[in-house]
């Protein structure tokens, strides 16, 4: 009986050790963060009349709900709320932020457009001929693109139509250093007088991606027609390297869409500092 008890205890300890080992592996990422999302898809008509134009707002807000470090969780939520909805909502709970933002968007839409729509109705006999630009929309969708040890890459996709020929859309990235509890900037990654050398690397990579050999050839395609090609703070880190993300109009016309330029770490070794996050990504 005693022998059976000892054997059973050994099995229990062995299984427990295996489970704790699994948990350690699962929680190897700083903060052991767990995420949820708040989703909204709401349509509201002018004058609350379904026969009239409407606005549509879509939100999918990803945020941390649990962490082994509450200060880290709260800090991330502050950055994410600010980036998605603006500084005025900092300090509010995520659920309340999304609720208030949705209500404010609808309220401002009606306040701004109802007087103009009323005037248009007076001037035009056929209500259906009133411009479609009264139908507004806004989308804010975010997600965690990468969560690896001390790094969390957070992407925000934004699109909006407020009348005119077309809407506008853009993506914004936050590369969160989870030990410092703040976003990484280029100065945290590169050392010395890196900007000119990094600019050359971006031009060279763009030429390689587009199979041309000169700056002029790129310019003929539309690159650098709306802004200078230079390192942007809108970038994201990955195991492949650093990707610089240029939204529409940053360096190209709307018709060309956004531009991504990925520079492998090996091409930038002479410019990189000793940030531990880079070492983890390169391993």
Residue ranges of predicted features:
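Bacterial Sec-dependent N-terminal signal peptides
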Residues: 1-34
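Compositionally biased intrinsically disordered regions enriched in Thr/Gly
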Residues: 22-283
């Amino acid at each position: 009986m005693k022998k059976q008890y000892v054997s059973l205890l050994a099995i229990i300890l062995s299984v427990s050790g295996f489970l704790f080992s699994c948990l350690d592996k699962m929680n190897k990422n700083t903060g052991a963060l767990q995420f949820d999302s708040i989703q909204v898809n709401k349509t509201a008509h002018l004058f609350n009349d379904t026969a009239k134009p409407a606005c549509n707002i879509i939100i999918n807000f990803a945020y941390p709900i649990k962490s082994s470090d509450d200060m880290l969780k709260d800090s991330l939520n502050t950055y994410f709320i600010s980036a998605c909805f603006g500084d005025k909502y900092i300090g509010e709970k995520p659920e309340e932020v999304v609720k208030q933002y949705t209500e404010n968007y609808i309220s401002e839409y009606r306040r701004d457009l109802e007087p103009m729509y009323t005037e248009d109705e007076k001037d035009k006999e056929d209500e259906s001929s009133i411009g479609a630009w009264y139908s507004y929309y806004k989308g804010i969708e975010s997600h965690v693109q990468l969560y690896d040890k001390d790094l969390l890459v957070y992407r925000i996709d934004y699109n909006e139509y407020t009348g005119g020929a077309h809407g506008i859309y853009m993506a914004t990235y936050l590369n969160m250093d989870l030990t410092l509890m703040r976003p990484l900037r280029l100065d945290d990654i590169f050392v010395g007088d890196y900007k000119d050398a990094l600019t050359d690397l971006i031009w060279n990579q763009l030429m390689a991606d587009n199979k041309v050999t000169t700056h002029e050839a790129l310019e003929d395609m539309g690159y650098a027609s709306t802004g200078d090609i230079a390192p942007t703070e809108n970038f994201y880190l990955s195991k492949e390297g650093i990707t610089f993300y240029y939204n529409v109009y940053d360096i190209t016309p709307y018709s060309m869409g956004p531009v991504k330029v990925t520079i492998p770490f090996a091409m930038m070794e002479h410019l990189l500092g000793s940030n531990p996050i880079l070492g983890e990504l390169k391993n």
